[in-house]
Amino acid sequence: MPFNGYQTYYRIVGDRQSNKTPLVLLHGGPGSTHNYFEGFDDLAAQTGRPIVMYDQLGCGRSSIPDDDQLWQAAMWVAELRALRTYLDLPEIHLLGQSWGGMLAIIYGCDYRPQGIKSLILASTLSSARLWAQEQHRMIRLMSPVDQSAIATAERLQDFTGAAYLTANQHFMTQHASGPITADDPEFLRRSKRVGTTAYNVAWGPNEYNPTGTLADYEYTDRLQYLQMPTLVTSGTDDLCTPLVAKTMVDQLPHATWTLFPRSRHMAFIDENTAYMTRLRHWLAAHD
C-alpha cells in the first residue's frame, strides 16, 4: 500500500467475501512486525473471517525511512486510517497488542472512528507512567545481580553493557517472550527486520524507560470515549500486569477482561488454543 511516499506491507487471510466482519491486527513495538500474528491464520481458516495484518512503517516488509521525525503516534494513526480506506474496511474488529493497543486507544479516543464493532486490547496499557512503575516493581523481584545491572545502566544511561543486556534478557524472557527454539512455529523462527530505530525513538531503550515520543502517553482518563464493546486480555506473568490491565478495565465503559494463567506478554502464543477459543467466541458475539 502506498503511504506518504513509502510502502506499507499488508497481508490478508480468510475470505474477503465472507459476511463476517474483518479483524484488523495492530502489532507491538513499535517495530515488532506482523510475524507473530500469523498464529491467527488458523482462526481465519476455521471461521472464514478475513483477518488483516500489516507491518507498520519502520519495520518488516514495509519501508524503513531514515527519518527520526516520522516516529510519532500521529503518523502510525494516519497509516491505519489509510489502510482502512485503501482496503475498503468500513466495519472492523480491531485488535492491538502492546504498542498496537496504545495505537488503537489513541485512534479510538482522539479520532472517534466509525465502524469499530469491537476492540480487543491485548497486553497493552493506558499510562506510560504506570507501565514504567510496574516494570520497576517486577525488576525488584529479580536477582540482586540483575537488579544491580539494570540500576547501574539506568544511572549511567548506558544500555550497552554485557551485565545489563543479560539482565534485560532475563526480564524479557520472564515477562515477554522467548527464547525461540527449533520447536517454535516457522513464523516465530523466521528472520525479520525489526524496527529498532522506531522503537528507540518512539518508546525508549527498554520496556521500563519510556523516554521517546510516547513518554507522555496518558490515556486512562480518556478511555471513557471508547464506547464500543472491549475485550482486555493479558497474562499472569505479563509486562501488562494485572494492575495495568485492571486500570483500563475500570475506566472502559463496556469492558470484559480475560486473564490467561500461563501467559506472558503474548497470550496468543503462550496459550494459543485458549486464546483463539476466547477470541472466536468474542468476535461471533459482536459481529
UniProtKB/Swiss-Prot annotation:
It holds the Pfam family Abhydrolase_1. It comes from the Bacteria. It is an enzyme of class 3 (hydrolase). Its EC number is 3.4.11.5. It catalyses: Release of N-terminal proline from a peptide. InterPro entries: AB_hydrolase_1 (IPR000073), AB_hydrolase_fold (IPR029058), AB_hydrolase_sf (IPR050266), Peptidase_S33 (IPR002410), Pro_imino_pep (IPR005945). The active site is at S98 (nucleophile), D238, H265 (proton donor). GO terms for biological process: proteolysis. Coiled coil: none annotated. Gene3D superfamilies: alpha/beta hydrolase (3.40.50.1820). Keywords: Aminopeptidase, Hydrolase, Protease. The keyword Hydrolase applies. Residues 22-271 form the AB hydrolase-1 domain. GO terms for cellular component: cell envelope; membrane. Belongs to the peptidase S33 family. NCBIfam families: pro_imino_pep_2 (TIGR01250), ProImpepLactob (NF045945). PANTHER family: HYDROLASE, PUTATIVE (AFU_ORTHOLOGUE AFUA_2G14860)-RELATED (PTHR43798:SF33), MONOACYLGLYCEROL LIPASE (PTHR43798). Releases the N-terminal proline from various substrates. This is Proline iminopeptidase. It comes from Lactiplantibacillus plantarum (strain ATCC BAA-793 / NCIMB 8826 / WCFS1) (Lactobacillus plantarum). The lineage of its organism: Bacteria, Bacillati, Bacillota, Bacilli, Lactobacillales.
